[in-house]
Amino acid sequence: MMRTFEQLTASQQKEVERQLQLYMTGAHEVIPPEELKAKLVKSISTGTPLKIKLGLDPSAPDVHLGHTVVLNKLRQFQENGHIVQLLIGDFTGKIGDPTGKSAARKQLTDEEVQHNAKTYFEQFGKVLDPEKVELHYNSKWLKTLNLEDVIELAGKITVARLMERDDFEERIAMQKPISLHEFFYPLMQGYDSVVLESDIELGGTDQHFNVLMGRHFQERYNKEKQVVILMPLLEGLDGVEKMSKSKHNYIGINEHPNDMYGKTMSLPDSLMKKYIHLATDLELEEKKQLVKDLETGAVHPRDAKMLLARTIVRMYHGEKAAEAAEHSFKTVFQENSLPEDIPAVNWKGEKTIAMIDLLVKLKLLSSKSEARRMIQNGGVRIDGEKVTDVHAKAEIRENMIIQVGKRKFLKLQ
């Protein structure tokens, strides 16, 4: 017989309350919170760890700080002895999650899915303990379903329920087609939770519909329903859009420490509190104190942002790299001097070359149009002198230093 909270010992009750507060802190929504508490009571009273699921569509494997909001929450469960279920949607990934899309997505090949899944797992090791992760591929069970199984699965949900998705409604309103196979994505994601018997599923707020499918199908298959924890979406460097590589407003966890530090320092002040709470591993009381100091003016926003930048770099590259990145930032931006470790390139090309062509050939910028925009915006300097003419020619000379933006430097030899 399952024990109630009141039947636990005082120390067990204290542990339930501690974990409950930990997991709910920073979450956008817990559905429903009373069931989360009940699951913790059962786990702590029986010594049975909970199974925490995170589903991944391996279509964009570069992990940035936006992804780590959910990963950091997952790590909290892992550190308290619960089982992390990383579900690679190698089967569903070939369909593509239509969430937030105004058109159907290109299907991935098996090779693309496997490569992206491997890349994901390697990067997640910077946040999670990979030795304590259960890695699952949903093709293991979805490939075994026959037509009768699929029809049975489809019969456990209505078309009206599937049409509640905002993106489907928008596409119908815009007279854009919806392929039948797209309806199966949330069905299969929900069925994953049935197979894994997950106790809790994590996701961003944009995954609200999909993760609730797990609860729906677990109930229809007479399983205990999972609790859903939705985490906030992290805005990118522009302070407006959700962090995304396609929006060019992201901080990648594999980026060079100097770039990571510099990008963090470019954040709008209005985002600092959110980043402190969602993107750092500081203790809860440290986070609260730092935010309080910001609000009262006890700490200057610049100093708080430097602490934020140093913390983020330290999390993914270590303390020494964080200190070096801070030193480099101070040297370049606060003392207006050049960094000490400017990479050098042995130039064997023309002695005179169009500035735009030079920037692209050196891979400082990815295209001529991007190089043109950077020059127009005053972001290119040669030996400290700003380049203002998009048609300018560069006269190549030894030890010439090219600066692009605030953080890219290159010396020609």
Swiss-Prot record:
User: What general EC class does the enzyme of this chain belong to?
Assistant: ligase
> GO terms for CC?
cytosol
Per UniProt, the short sequence motif 'HIGH' region occupies residue numbers 58-67
Q: Which GO terms describe its molecular function?
A: ATP binding; RNA binding; tyrosine-tRNA ligase activity
Q: What is its EC number?
A: 6.1.1.1
Q: What are the start and end residues of each sequence repeat?
A: 89-94, 96-101
Report the family membership.
Answer: Belongs to the class-I aminoacyl-tRNA synthetase family. TyrS type 2 subfamily.
Annotated function: Catalyzes the attachment of tyrosine to tRNA(Tyr) in a two-step reaction: tyrosine is first activated by ATP to form Tyr-AMP and then transferred to the acceptor end of tRNA(Tyr).
The protein's name: Tyrosine--tRNA ligase 2
